[in-house]
Regions:
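Generic structural signal for well-ordered alpha-helices
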Residues: 1, 24-28, 55-63, 156, ...
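Acidic (Asp/Glu)-rich catalytic clusters
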Residues: 1-8, 20-40, 119-125, 155-164
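Active-site beta->alpha N-cap acidic-glycine motif
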Residues: 1-33, 82, 144-145, 150, ...
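C-terminal domain-boundary segment and adjacent tail
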Residues: 4-11, 149-262
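Structural preference for beta-strand elements that scaffold enzyme active sites
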Residues: 10-12, 34-38, 73, 92-93, ...
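The substrate-binding groove and active-site-proximal loops of carbohydrate-active enzymes
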Residues: 10-17, 42-53, 69-73, 138-147, ...
């Protein structure tokens, strides 16, 4: 948090409720400093979406943590998702998808650099889906062995050109803060700070920096006020559940700046 605060940024932290020590004091401290705390699955075992019955049971437990933590945001471990089942969660938004990422265990991508809305079959319940639009730090630095921020910079510039949303997922446990030899998956935190500095310096005064909950609130207002929207078209790049929801007209894609944000 110190690193981001020094550069004028804030972010959201998502914690796995079971199997990890997540104290109320830690969550309160995060929120008190202007950051956000959300729920990251139930356990980090890759089994959350194995069966609909199993998810239904686990969703009850997840909702308990959402209420206890006073959180309205959810993130699935390993970016696994079923956007229809997630409607069982009492959330305002979810961040379990990505615009494009061939290195994730679940196939299919969303193919857009904008948030969108998922509606229940009755049309009353909905949540905002906020896909990440920049490669994860683990993919770039730990898996692919990149040593510069060139990929981030190139993608960010493309997003800006198309008036889209820059959403980056990082893992602080991979940050190497002292440049000493750590575990093999660590990378210098300077790569992250250099990217934040690039954003701040090149695009000063040109971006709206908010927490995910604020982004979700913005798009929720658009949903309830029947703001201008564009329906997504089913595509082979999407997972089967996403294609089904689109065909049922339960997915609404927003383009608030009137630009073409499809990849």
């Amino acid at each position: 948090m110190d690193v981001e605060e020094q550069l004028g940024f804030r972010s959201a932290f998502y914690f796995v409720p079971r199997g990890y020590a997540v104290s109320p004091e830690l969550r309160r401290h995060i929120v008190s400093r202007g950051f956000e705390a959300g729920v990251h699955g139930l356990e980090h075992d890759g089994k959350l979406y194995n069966t609909k019955k199993g998810f239904k049971k686990k969703s009850t437990e997840i909702n308990k943590y959402l209420k206890e933590w006073n959180s309205n945001g959810f993130s699935s471990p390993c970016m696994q998702h079923n956007l229809e089942w997630i409607l069982d969660l009492n959330i305002q938004y979810d961040i379990s998808t990505y615009d494009t990422d061939p290195f994730e265990p679940q196939g299919g991508c969303i193919g857009t650099i904008f948030p969108f809305c998922i509606q229940g079959s009755s049309g009353e319940k909905y949540y905002v889906e906020i896909p990440y639009t920049l490669p994860q730090d683990f993919t770039l630095f730990s898996l692919m062995g990149q040593t510069t921020i060139d990929v981030w910079v190139k993608k960010l510039d493309w997003i800006v050109e198309h008036g889209g949303m820059a959403h980056l997922k990082t893992h602080p446990d991979y940050f190497n803060f002292d440049n000493k030899n750590g575990h093999t998956e660590e990378y210098p935190v300077s790569l992250y700070t250099n990217f934040l500095e690039y954003i701040k310096n090149k695009y000063a005064g040109q971006y709206w920096h908010v927490l995910p909950k604020d982004m979700a609130q913005f798009y929720s207002a658009g949903t309830t006020n029947n703001a201008a929207r564009t329906p997504l078209t089913p595509s082979d790049i999407l997972c089967s559940t996403c294609r089904k929801l689109i065909k049922q007209k339960r997915v609404t894609f927003f383009m608030p700046f009137g630009t073409n944000g499809h990849e």
